[in-house]
Amino acid sequence: MSNLAQVRALSKGRVTLGIRMTDRPGWRQLSELLDLGPWPPTDLEMDFDQYVFACVLSRALEEIDAGEATATEATGLSQVELRDILNRSFPAPTIHVFRLEEVRDSEPGPEEALLRGLLLAHARAGDSASVLFAKIIARRALRHDHLWRELGLFDRVELSRLLASHFPTLAAGNTQNMRWKKYFYRKLCEAEGYSLCTAPSCPQCKELESCFGSGEGESASPVGKVGGEA
């Protein structure tokens, strides 16, 4: 099956190479754009990184169309980085819908910079994709919903796979299956030598469920629901 055919299958909510997607507006729009041109010939199987980029871009499209963010604001990437991803992985017409010529680069705030630094410190050496994902994850982690949802992924399992692949030492430290955003902030606190938690141990903490709950919710549920964490 060609990469384009796989994306079409994914956009219809089918199971393809173990990856499932629901019929979200951003993904529908992205898959419709893919019909306008040929998918660049790569490996027979759809690369997981490429799939994640497509998920993130579909989520960004939803925010762009809603007037909530520009492409750079939604992804944490620069114009140059976004253009490079689109040129390498998507047909030419896809670029125009992101309106890159109309936007400016979005600089990270202090909190985002700390998250980005944490991820970069554990990024896979010499992998440019890991750097891009560090920026994307740091930006999307500032949103209020589950991190996997804010990345446009199908479920938390896909997020765990992404982190294990690109930030292996960081992911390996989450031995108790802590929710990822909670885990990130715990690591930041540890690096600064203090803790936000006043309980002597996790089992005695009243926030136990918020830190160690499944974080699943409904897989690929409609975007816009807030209040959860991955």
Swiss-Prot record:
Q: Which InterPro entries match?
A: NifQ (IPR006975)
Protein family (similarity comment): Belongs to the NifQ family.
| Task of the protein | Probably involved in molybdenum processing.
Q: Which gene encodes it?
A: nifQ
Q: What is this protein called?
A: Protein NifQ homolog
GO molecular-function term, one example from the UniProt record: molybdenum ion binding
Q: Which UniProt keywords apply?
A: Molybdenum, Nitrogen fixation, Plasmid
Q: Which Pfam families match?
A: NifQ (PF04891)
GO BP annotations, alphabetical order: nitrogen fixation
**Origin: domain of life:** Bacteria
